[in-house]
Amino acid sequence: LTIVLILGASAVVAQEAAPARAQEVRVHVTSGGRAVTDLKMADFTVLEDGRALSVGALTSVQGGRVVFREGEGALPVSLDRSYTLLFQIMDWDPVLSEAVDHLFAAVLQPGDAVSLVTPFQAYHLQRDALAGRSKAELQKSMTDVLRKDILRGSGEYRGLVNELKRLTKSIGGSTTTFDEDLGTDPSMESSGGFGLEMQIDRYRQALMAMEGIRLVDEAKLLAFAGSLRPVPGQKTVIMFYQREYRPEISPATMNRLMSLYQDNPDILGNLMDLFQFYKREKTFDAGRVKKAFADAGIDFHFIFVEKKTQRVFGATMREQSEDTYPGFVEIAQATGGTAASSLNPSAAFKHAAAVSSDYYILSFRPGQVPGDGAFRTYDVRVARPGCKAVFPVGFYAR
């Protein structure tokens, strides 16, 4: 996954080197889909591991500004803002440029930091960039980079998908027109099923290569969270993840081949091996990652970009995102962020940016949390009817 390009530090090292945890929790409150910005300290109840906390102060932040503060125990509030946009996108969509337009036109302010991570590499916009260059210039530059890198970085992936389509159709025709399929590839021979073995082997290699490209590395996700933990202020991370489809040999074709070659143990063994690749195993522990993201104070928003499936004769187009989608949704929910599936990623981005801009910081009286390194959970409740509060699930006590 491309987010590995941002920083390579160990999450454990980052946590040990970070300053002591500020005793506070960031809370977003909505009602009917709109932010609620007029709550007071008395409207909130905060529990830690089921034990009520004494809230010492409340700070309301709207659009990067402190609107009001209440209570005498308020900790210093950093108004620094950093935005990280992650793109796991294989097909360029001009709608993505609308999201970048909105970022510069309606979200970013002087002093904000931006990181853009494409399928090819990461780019960082320093906090003073908006003061030295126009928003229009920066927006065009970022859009050009995004489009170029998506087209460039996804070339290998698209090539593998096309290879899988070709091989799937060819293997699917093995029971009837196999000799015709082999006629286009001089490296294969049809006698004794040798050509079929070669095609299955190539198909398996293409599957392995595709898995390597899309691998979500848990250690890198933890390191990413650890790298952001010492960063002060609001930390908004928005991931665009495009729905993926993979060409697979249809069950009917698989059964027909296994029946036809039941006396050929080599081909039967190769076909059985494919079932192992079709099994979708989780590639990262969402529970561990969501704790690291929550502890780092990250607002993580997950935008699942829908994509229409294609029909391929002789193949089954299998959804390939089911092993990662639930995990990222879980991380978003655990950090007080949002998760959305949409054919319009620009609209989903606007919603995520709006949600992240207005929040309350509830400060706790000092000395209530023993620094034993255990993960402690939060529960924040709002007394006003109809209000929904979202917040990080907890923190590592230090």
Walk through the language-model features, giving the residues of each.
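Bacterial N-terminal signal peptides
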Residues: L1-S10
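Scaffold/interface architecture of coatomer-like assemblies
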Residues: A14-R398
